[in-house]
Amino acid sequence: MDLSGCGTALITPFRADESIDEPALRALVDWQIASGIDWLVACGTTAETPTLTHDEWLRVIRIIAEQAAGRVPVWAGCTHNATRQAVENARQAAQIPGVTAILVANPYYNKPTQQGLYEHFLAVARAVELPVVLYNIPSRTGCNLEPETVLRLVGAAPNIAAIKESSSNLPQIGELLTRAPESFRVYSGDDNMALGTIALGGAGLVSVASNEIPREMAEMVRAAVQNDWALARQLHRKYFPLLQANFLETSPGPVKAVLAMMGRIEERYRLPMTPVSSATRARLERLAGELGLLVETPVPQR
């Protein structure tokens, strides 16, 4: 999978009745692409995917892939903590026109061994022909996908093409980049670790902040990939306070709050996600104002 740059892990906008806000989602896709984002991720962590029904999960992927219309690649998040269901999810997502890769995180809650992780990901990879992107996010899943296991998987399934590394463990990322084949892509899954990952040989970033600042994050990552480190550092320093503030509370709470301030979505969540606190909201509003993000954008008509 020859893909470098910045992809966005899209949020899922909801209405007051908690239904999916399809016009807002389609508008977000168009804005992301017009802003220079290199690919989109449907139904990842930032999308509140565990709160979606299976039919809603399929619908969100279809909407994003349909609206992207081949302009950028689309990765479909197919994570499940039951391997059988993860396999079925991957098979269903792979049939959606416009889906170009399958993203699968470690099974959450189960806390499998490395052998369990190996067999889980291998089963998913063998069920589809599309490239499979591993997704290591121990803080959410309760288990870490170790480099040795990744290397075993790469050797066993040729369509395991990449990993989204959200462990925030730079030595682990460095080990993986040192030992993996050059064709295997490593993407940072952490905005704050993007430049470090790219400096070690990573291919780019799957970003949360690019929901709010797609053009700026795409420019920062592109600069790093092209070895323009002066520009990359300049942009990172400018937007670092926002990258930090996005995790003052559980994501995507802060990101959705900022997008609502920008007029791009209604600020709606599904429990157990709740609106951010008044203190967090005040800090986000101040940062968004300082960064010039509060230009009014009408929420798409329904």
Swiss-Prot record:
Query: Would I find Methyltransferase among this entry's keywords?
Result: no
Q: Which residues bind pyruvate?
A: 46, 206
Q: Which NCBIfam families match?
A: dapA (TIGR00674)
Gene that this polypeptide is encoded by:
dapA
Recorded protein name is: 4-hydroxy-tetrahydrodipicolinate synthase
Gene Ontology cellular-component annotations: cytosol
PANTHER family from the xrefs? 4-HYDROXY-2-OXOGLUTARATE ALDOLASE, MITOCHONDRIAL, DIHYDRODIPICOLINATE SYNTHASE
Q: Which organism is it from?
A: Acidobacterium capsulatum (strain ATCC 51196 / DSM 11244 / BCRC 80197 / JCM 7670 / NBRC 15755 / NCIMB 13165 / 161)
**A GO molecular-function descriptor:** 4-hydroxy-tetrahydrodipicolinate synthase activity
GO BP, one example? lysine biosynthetic process via diaminopimelate
Q: In which pathway does it act?
A: Amino-acid biosynthesis; L-lysine biosynthesis via DAP pathway; (S)-tetrahydrodipicolinate from L-aspartate: step 3/4
